[in-house]
């Protein structure tokens, strides 16, 4: 069989996707005797004019960065006594720089953290508890205003360390032009997104074509982009978990996980509606109109909107298994441990403002964590964001475990081995489980 013209791409589009597999300096902090934040001065800057200076770090280098700058600008105008200095650091180096700043001083007063990283950082006691601010703000501003899953992600143990800014779930992007050409339409003649696996497979088969007659498909019904989030979504729909309830053992070789991985393999080799993980860039192929469907995060919306001539829409992820599930994550707003009381209160004011103002954030391609804002007409008018937001009741995050960031580099090669047809799901996940367990057993 000749190589496919498509390949999977796990590259992160600048400013949209986020890098998880970065080397962490937290182990170095531990070797040096624990987090040094308490020994240094965080959040103590004051401008010559008497203003409180807040340093705010994030990794928003794309269109989301422009939206954040606008939100911060609005805060500055409404709070002339607070000077916010925003620094944008590419995600590829962001966590290394943040780690060093938290350990040795100079940490920002407010910083963005992905939900999956909070347990890791707080396991080294680097974050400031925010419980007193939530207590002072309740009941007008608190748990009832947020979606349950991102709200829970702000806790480590019994204490709360963050404000959830958004939720970025995976969903289905589909090419409306190819759908209409294949006759996959509703009563109004509009492209009809699949809701079930049967509908999904039927649509994928109709759109997989050899348009130039060379014996190989050059138009595909579906393509895997980020294998990790695709697998987590499908596995979640089969009721799978990555770790045992106590977080001490891997459950990657459970029947539910294996069924999900087998289904992904079958889409390539049995149903032949998706390309093998090799060839050209899979996400680029979707952007260029050569693929009918892709499961991707809401954070990729901007790259589609920038693509001239692409007719697309968004929908919830089809239900491949017996239950609804969709992978997701969140950007959280945090403060460093050891921040002064004055700066902590000013930082909280900024954090609350960004949450309150997150309809601007939504327009940049995110789903607000705030339930009241998602009900607003301005958000309802954002068609793709609104469609993806319908999944929040069953969105599933990666394990909120201190070692989550360390275990996924051990899992992803197994997923790819199955997709390349060089390992069975059982063999690949058995080996991945062994490697993950070795990490979990370490102190």
Predicted regions and their residues:
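Extracytoplasmic "Venus flytrap"
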Residues: 48, 52-70, 89-91, 168, ...
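Extracytoplasmic "Venus flytrap"/periplasmic binding protein-like
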Residues: 70, 74-146, 159-162, 181-183, ...
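Short, polar/charged alpha-helical segment
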Residues: 61-83, 177-178, 411, 429
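Short, low-complexity disordered leader/linker segments with a strong preference
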Residues: 1-55, 77, 382, 430, ...
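Extracytoplasmic/periplasmic solute-binding protein
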Residues: 41-42, 156-165, 170, 180, ...
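Hinge/lid segment of periplasmic solute-binding proteins
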Residues: 115-171, 198-201, 224, 234, ...
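Glycine-centered hinge/linker elements that transmit conformational signals in sensory
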Residues: 201-208, 246-276
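C-terminal lobe and pocket-closing loops
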Residues: 135, 300-311, 320-413, 441-442
């Amino acid at each position: 069989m000749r190589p496919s013209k498509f390949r999977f791409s796990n590259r992160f589009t600048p400013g949209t996707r986020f890098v998880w597999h970065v080397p962490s300096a937290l182990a170095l902090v531990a070797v040096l005797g624990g987090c040094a934040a308490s020994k240094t001065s965080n959040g103590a800057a004051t401008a010559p004019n008497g203003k409180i200076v807040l340093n705010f770090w994030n990794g928003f280098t794309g269109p989301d960065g422009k939206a954040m700058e606008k939100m911060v600008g609005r805060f500055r105008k409404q709070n002339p006594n607070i000077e916010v200095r925003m620094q944008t650091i590419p995600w590829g180096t962001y966590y290394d720089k943040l780690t060093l700043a938290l350990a040795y001083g100079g940490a920002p007063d407010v910083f963005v953290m992905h939900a999956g990283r909070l347990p890791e950082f707080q396991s080294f006691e680097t974050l400031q508890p925010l419980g007193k601010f939530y207590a002072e703000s309740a009941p007008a501003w608190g748990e009832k205003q947020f979606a349950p899953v991102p709200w829970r992600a702000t806790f480590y143990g019994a204490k709360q360390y963050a404000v959830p800014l958004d939720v970025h779930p995976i969903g289905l992007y589909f090419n409306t032009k190819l759908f209409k050409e294949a006759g996959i339409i509703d009563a109004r003649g509009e492209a009809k997104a699949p809701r079930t696996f049967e509908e999904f497979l039927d649509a994928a088969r109709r759109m997989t074509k050899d348009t130039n007659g060379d014996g190989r498909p050059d138009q595909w019904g579906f393509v895997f982009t980020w294998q990790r989030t695709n697998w987590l979504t499908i596995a979640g729909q089969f009721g799978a978990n990555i770790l045992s309830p106590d977080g001490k053992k891997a459950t990657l070789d459970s029947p539910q996980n294996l069924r999900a991985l087998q289904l992904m393999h079958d889409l390539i080799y049995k149903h032949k509606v998706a390309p093998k993980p090799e060839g050209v860039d899979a996400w680029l192929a979707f952007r260029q109109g050569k693929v009918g469907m892709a499961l991707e995060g809401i954070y990729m919306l901007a790259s589609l909107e920038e693509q001239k001539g692409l007719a697309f829409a968004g929908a919830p992820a089809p239900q491949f298994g017996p239950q609804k599930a969709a992978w997701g994550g969140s950007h959280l707003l945090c403060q460093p441990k050891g921040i002064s009381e004055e700066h902590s209160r000013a930082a909280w004011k900024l954090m609350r403002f960004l949450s309150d103002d997150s309809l601007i954030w939504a327009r940049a391609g995110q789903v607000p964590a705030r339930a009241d804002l998602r009900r607003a007409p301005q958000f309802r008018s954002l068609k793709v964001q609104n469609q993806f937001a319908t999944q929040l009741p069953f969105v599933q995050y990666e394990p909120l475990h201190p070692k989550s960031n360390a275990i996924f580099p051990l899992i992803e090669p197994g997923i790819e081995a199955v997709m390349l047809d060089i390992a069975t799901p059982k063999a690949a996940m058995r080996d991945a489980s062994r490697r993950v367990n070795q990490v979990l057993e370490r102190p």
